[in-house]
Amino acid sequence: MNKDLTVGSPSKVLWQFCLPMFGSILFQQLYNIADSLVAGKLIGENALAAVGNSYEITLIFLAFSFGCNIGGSVIVSRYFGAKDYNTMKTAVSTALIGTVVLCGALMAVGLLGCRSLLVLIRTPAELMADSAEYLDIYTLGLPFLFLYNVATGIFTALGDSRTPFLFLAVSSTANIAVDVLFVAAFDMGVAGVAWATFLCQGVSCVLSLWVVARRVRAVPSEGERVWFSWKMLGQIAVVAIPSILQQSFVSVGNIIIQSVVNSFGASVIAGFAAATKLNNVLISSLTTLGSGISNYASQNLGAGKNERVRAGFGAGVKLLGSICLCFTALYLLAGRQLLMLFMNSPTGEAINTGLTFLQTIAPFYLLLAFKLTSDGLMRGCGMMGRFMATTLSDLFLRVVLAILFSGWLGVNGIWLSWPVGWFVGTLLSMVFYRTSIHRQAEEKTTL
């Protein structure tokens, strides 16, 4: 069901629109968490470390996938908000075609270069074979990942956040069952974990494309439809490329940090891998909700309702802030128990590593509510330069400080780089929001 985000109370609209997205990303995270849970519990600590080590590299592919999602979603939602449905349909098909071409190129790069990247990040010898096998299978499934994410972006652009939630609920649950089947029953090891994700994402991709095609066809439009437009691809790229670069830089930064962590041994890698999975449940949730705020801003911008864009800030901070506080309490109170879920016979070093990481960063989660709400509004309004600046400042500080602090304070020094980077990034985001979107809406209101 398509939904118009340009009418109704901004708070109510955002909560109703974004909560299914929050549920969706929780189920999306089940893919990665299930992989790590099964690897750690049914195979061993080294298998958990191998999957976690590979995960940082898969984030590069996810960065491109997320950029395609955002680029298509923001442009489609803008034309949907303006009720220019024929152009909206051109944006949908152009986004899908462009994604297929990009995905093909990335598959070739991934299959040829993943092993070299594993060597570059100083993957321990005992983890190399499993890490490489996991990455190879993951790369083969990139078309499913990319097309599914673009389809999800189209759903949210049309105001429908419930359909992706239903797809993910079913496929994520199935992924857990297939993970256990392939590893416990068929004894496929780390490869079984990867093939389970490949299979379940493939089914989700095909079904979501079928439904989105029917949904787009049902939108009334006049005139002959253009299936591909270079001009439209350019509009999508203007939004997608900064998002891809932003996410890619974050991924590269995470890989650099992973290489620093790798120098401390397999037990530290395993503990960090488990804690990162938990941390990414929140980060990915907030990022996805930020893209929902972008859709809200883009639809209202297309409809010429700038004052509603400004009103979305308070509603967004309340939504994201409430989620941040819940996760802060959860990780501080039950961090050890959650980390134990990933390990069958954990070493004390692995558990202590993960727990220290969570206890260091969780108290600062609330900063992200302000940052990602501001970023979402700026991205939805096409202010990509400012959006990138906030993210890159955060990333740069995290990478530099992780390297410096690890030399002075050991592995625990690495974790301190997160809150420092978040603080600076949040400060910049708030300044940019106040001097751009907030001021523009305020000036329009007083005219």
Task: Please give the residue ranges for each predicted region.
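Short runs within selected transmembrane alpha-helices of multi-pass transporters and secretion channels
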Residues: 69, 138-156, 164-175, 193-208, ...
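Short alpha-helical transmembrane segments in multi-pass integral membrane proteins
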Residues: 1-18, 76-141, 185-241, 297-363, ...
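Transmembrane helical elements of multi-pass membrane transporters/channels
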Residues: 16-35, 137, 148, 171, ...
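Alpha-helical transmembrane segments and their lipid-water interface positions
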Residues: 28, 32-39, 62-69, 73, ...
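Small-residue-rich hydrophobic transmembrane alpha-helices
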Residues: 48-108, 145-164, 271-333, 368-382, ...
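Transmembrane alpha-helix boundary and packing residues in multipass membrane permease domains
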Residues: 21, 25, 37, 74, ...
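Helix-terminus/linker motif at the lipid-water interface of multi-pass membrane proteins
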Residues: 30-49, 118-125, 181-188, 248-277, ...
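N-terminal transmembrane alpha-helices
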Residues: 5-42, 56-71, 75, 100-107, ...
